Amino acid sequence: MTTAPFLFPSLSRLHSARASSFPKPPVGSGAGVAFPARPYGSSLRLRSSVMAATGVGGNGSPMAPEESTVSSRLGEVKRVTKETNVHVKINLDGTGVANSSTGIPFLDHMLDQLASHGLFDVYVKATGDTHIDDHHSNEDIALAIGTALLQALGDRKGINRFGHFTAPLDEAAVEVILDLSGRPHLSCGLSIPTERVGTYDTQLVEHFFQSLVNTSGMTLHIRQLAGNNSHHIIEATFKAFARALRQATEYDLRRQGTIPSSKGVLSRS
């Protein structure tokens, strides 16, 4: 678990020396949260999506992207339903700082892995009907994270697009292959031997990734190579996913800002 202080300067302070394309956070969305930028070459110009919030029943839809010289790729989504209230912020160009409070302790632990091993800054605050079970919160958190990823990626110019990583954890080993293609698909080959890890229903692992895939538009293959400890299998999965996603979202300098597709476009449509 990351132990560094989780400090978020305001957006105006973070970009005081330059004009920012980001509006102030909407009223009622909580305190403004910004992530420290990780610098790139001066010739690299990104398109950053404007942070968006959703109403009841939505998954979070990013507004049209605007030209920006801001290095960090940020996504923010607020998803509110009768079952859950979820607020997600993600910085693809972060330093691995996590601040998660989902009401599901084991999921908080897994989101720490996503941040730490992906070097993403991840902020997730959620409340929900966990007195029934964790299903709704688990699903809606994943839907919001997927939408925030989609938003932060923008038009995906210059990224590697593909990621592949195998992570071991003691006797467990899990392989993850992904493509930020805009085409949602999940193949999940996990064999988790117990029904629960702590209070967490292990059936929710596959459902988490299916929900994330649906809104992010990625193709994701998960294959368990070894393992007989449920905690180790799930944690190895999140670690491998984090490293594969980091690889896919990082920049290929040889592309010089071009879209990594022979079609010339990567989108959900």
UniProtKB/Swiss-Prot annotation:
Binding residues for Mn(2+) 1: 109, 136, 231, 235
Disulphides: none
Needed cofactors: Mn(2+)
Pathways per UniProt: Amino-acid biosynthesis; L-histidine biosynthesis; L-histidine from 5-phospho-alpha-D-ribose 1-diphosphate: step 6/9
Listed PROSITE patterns: IGP_DEHYDRATASE_1, IGP_DEHYDRATASE_2
Primary location group: plastid
Cofactor, how bound (note): Binds 2 manganese ions per subunit.
GO MF annotations in UniProt: imidazoleglycerol-phosphate dehydratase activity; metal ion binding
Family: Belongs to the imidazoleglycerol-phosphate dehydratase family.
Protein name, per record: Imidazoleglycerol-phosphate dehydratase 2, chloroplastic
